[in-house]
């Protein structure tokens, strides 16, 4: 009796956690609706999009010429700055303009355009990663809620059985030991349900952050019980698709291209820029009212930008290695995702059609058979545990198959298999 009373106390403590979802606002949501909200409201994506806009603004900035420089000097000893009407007057004005040589301005514009392309690819890669997390969270929530329903169904059956056994115990038809074992089974199941509820809360938190939703809302994913996967691509086609579509591969290639453009720019910097100017000198030159044309350029004797050119050449070698590393990584990721999907597809095909429907009916019959004392308590408990294990494994297998398809989509950078 003390154990029975302890179990009842613990169950009463856990029940508020088990029923927590009922006190919150529940929203049924499809994967398509979740992705639409994600694309519109996710702040990480919005912030990354600003980087694209910033890079585009810097392209425009790179196109501008340097401002001209105005030089002048006047006398200040008597405060009469422009006494040019008298024999002592003096005015000196010089206007200069720097002219970029060796195509420096165009090369700088090209580097800025590379940065725009890089920012766009970073945005695409972030979206790819976040969408993968979103779809995995959706699949995880779907699995958790379906497992929750199995627990709730089993708990309801055991609670009904427990009430009947209490009456049978009072009538002396069953032993205290059998009654306690059923209550212990119920308690263990309720404990598992409470633990599952905490896992649901963690997944809901991450899902809500991705959707940027406020309030105490519980999202309930809407997905068909069975997931049909049809893969029509060969492994070679999948590898080519990943090479052409993955934004992180494109980003590595853009970095290599940008480093090549930077080398061209650094070589151009070794060519001196030309400064041209026009000047007027009223009285201090060899003649009054002197007009002159000025040209100046630094002599490339001490600094010919060799260090930066060498660094740019090394950056190209580094970028080449990074492209090769990225291509090898992508290849292995696609191969692993492909093999995983094939393995889970084969496992799914071994499950008989309508297996769980028959098992559910058998569970109801088993509960009734135990109430009618047609099976022993040990047989009932063994069957009950086996049913829970089989039902949850079936759900996990379906979720794993869906996740494997999502992983293949993720590793190839495009939707190879559409999952709703």
Model regions and ranges:
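Short, charged, amphipathic alpha-helical segments
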Residues: 110-113, 176-185, 377-385
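Bacterial Sec-pathway N-terminal export signals of envelope proteins
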Residues: 14, 21-69, 98-99, 107, ...
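Small/polar, glycine/serine/threonine/aspartate-rich low-complexity segments that form flexible
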Residues: 22-28, 71-104, 108-110, 221-232, ...
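Acidic, low-complexity, intrinsically disordered peripheral segments
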Residues: 22-24, 395-420
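Amphipathic alpha-helical coiled-coil segments
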Residues: 47-59, 126, 130-151, 167, ...
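Bacterial N-terminal signal peptides
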Residues: 8-17
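Periplasmic alpha-helical coiled-coil/stalk elements that build and connect Gram-negative outer-membrane
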Residues: 126-241, 337-344, 387
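A glycine-/polar-enriched beta->alpha junction
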Residues: 36-46, 53-68, 82-85, 93-110, ...
